[in-house]
Amino acid sequence: MSHSPAQLSASPSSVGDGDRLLRAARGEVVDRPPVWMMRQAGRYMAAYRELQSKYTFKQRCEIPELAIEISLQPFRAFAPDGVIMFSDILTPLEGMGIPFELVEQQGPIIDPPIRSQAQVEQIRLLEPEESLPFIKTILSTLRREVEGKATLLGFVGSPWTLACYAVEGRSSKDYAHIKSLAFTQPQVLHQLLSKLADSIARYVIYQIECGAQVVQLFDTWAGQLSPGDYETWALPYQKQIVDQVKARCPQVPLILYINGSAALLERVGKAGIDVFSLDWMSDMAEARARLGSLAVQGNLDPMVLLGSPKFIRQRTLEVIQKAGSRGHIMNLGHGVHHTTPEANVHHFFETVRQAAELLKAL
């Protein structure tokens, strides 16, 4: 595929130190915080929108040439320290016998939704190499492309969040169906979550074997649970994944992201993860104190990137200062908003790259 001069404006090789993110994820002190953005490959980029107009979302995720190109668009434009595979958290579900449809601007539709013991019993264990052959091509190619210049991230959905989609059948505001299942037929939901955890653990290990150096678990909707329910319905299945992955790949850092995690910060470390990805609704300094020795990722409000360059710089440096020098990966507290100007994203990345000098000048 051809690349316009604008896409080639940043030079990843010029920033060097391709393992900066990997080392920060292991809790090491680095020269500056590594930086990448959730949803950094996406609709805010003109280059992405051009492909979006020609190919379905499923095609963009599963045709290796497209997924590789989309993953590399922000790498060429902004030289982040982390490059994440372009995919979707629901991608492995079909290989488990849970078909879904991705509808533009609507999100995923799972019809029929999974709400009975009989349906749960039909779910099979994922065989990633058979069901997701494109993943190996995507990750192995990306690893070659970014080797020595950036850390390659894989990602998966965590069981509670995947179950939210499977049981609700679509995006939800109140999670009535899954909470009803939890509170009336708990054994059915526990069985579903355990099956999901075993398959997702396999998928994480497969991503690592294909080239991923760090893997992020998205349990986005676990923040919809009370602390007690989090310990019943989300935490054990996060841990089930982490335990299986660490038994096979002990050196690979695992990141956990939960949206709306403020009430859960003392609990998330029990999952055994290496890094907790913080949303923007918690103060970074307070969160670090509550998270203890865990490395942390985040947590700039994505909407800050709609502000002026001066405002973006100020708020970015505030987060970095509060996070301290050890075990911090700079990121947003959620995915970058699709209306964000690319120039503002560039300014955000440049601010982080210059953070040491800029903080000295304060």
From Swiss-Prot:
It catalyses: uroporphyrinogen III + 4 H(+) = coproporphyrinogen III + 4 CO2. Pfam families: URO-D. InterPro entries: UROD/MetE-like_sf, Uroporphyrinogen_deCO2ase_HemE, Uroporphyrinogen_deCOase. It comes from the Bacteria. The record marks 88 as: Transition state stabilizer. It is found in: Cytoplasm. GO terms for molecular function: uroporphyrinogen decarboxylase activity. One of its GO terms (biological process) is protoporphyrinogen IX biosynthetic process. Its main location: cytoplasm. Pathway: Porphyrin-containing compound metabolism; protoporphyrin-IX biosynthesis; coproporphyrinogen-III from 5-aminolevulinate: step 4/4. Its EC number is 4.1.1.37. Substrate binds at residues 39-43, 88, 165, 220, 334. It is an enzyme of class 4 (lyase). Keywords: Cytoplasm, Decarboxylase, Lyase, Porphyrin biosynthesis. One of its GO terms (cellular component) is cytoplasm. Disulfide bonds: none annotated. PANTHER family: METHYLTETRAHYDROFOLATE:HOMOCYSTEINE METHYLTRANSFERASE RELATED, UROPORPHYRINOGEN DECARBOXYLASE. Catalyzes the decarboxylation of four acetate groups of uroporphyrinogen-III to yield coproporphyrinogen-III. Homodimer. Belongs to the uroporphyrinogen decarboxylase family. This is Uroporphyrinogen decarboxylase. It comes from Synechococcus sp. (strain JA-3-3Ab) (Cyanobacteria bacterium Yellowstone A-Prime). The lineage of its organism: Bacteria, Bacillati, Cyanobacteriota, Cyanophyceae, Synechococcales. The gene is hemE.
